[in-house]
Amino acid sequence: MYQIIADEADFIVICKSANIHFHSQDGSAGVVAQAELDLGIKLYSVHRLDTLTSGLLILAKSSAAAAEFTRQFSQHKVQKYYLALAKGKPKKKQGWVIGDMAKSRRSMHKLLRSMDNPAKTQFFSHSVGDGIRLYLLKPLTGKTHQLRVALASIGVPILGDELYGGDASDRGYLHAYSLNFSYKAQAYQYSVAPPSGVAFNSPAVIEQLQQWQSPEQLTWPKVK
């Protein structure tokens, strides 16, 4: 269900497995509740991941720590980087996706042309063969389904994300790869490779991840 990546005085960082609920539902514990049971402490969620998404999550150990992380996330001071795989040729191979988002049908969201309160996403991509590209994504906002909608909007829904038109696969190929933030004047950086997924373990993907080990040091495409 999850792996503990770091256990600090005020927070833990875990790697959530794919296809695991964030919140408890249908009588089964979500990842936060399960971590609380395992560790025997109260944990506070400060951001979330969709069920299909694997990767890094910060869980605070106190309401004070949660308030600080919530402030940082709301002010976009936590840098987040994601990996995704998608089939097909995108409308552009790198750059940004920007636009307002709105609810659509079947729990979906859609990208609009308006810019009143836009979702902003920067990205790079690299071909890994068989018509598949690996995407490194940096969301500058935190909208629901933002990255899933961003890739679908440029013609390449995430592999395994059938809600947005992706081909069926062994998992949804979206992974929260890296986090950078400061807490109590100390800098923290965490990165973890995808824990599952046949396509994530291909030699071409593994080779490209060597080039993206420090995403915060890359020269990212400018966002308008």
Predicted regions and their residues:
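S4-like RNA-binding module at protein N-termini
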Residues: 1-26, 34-39, 63-64, 70-71
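Residue-level signal for inorganic ion chemistry
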Residues: 15-16, 58, 84, 123, ...
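A short alpha->loop->secondary-structure connector
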Residues: 28-31, 73-80
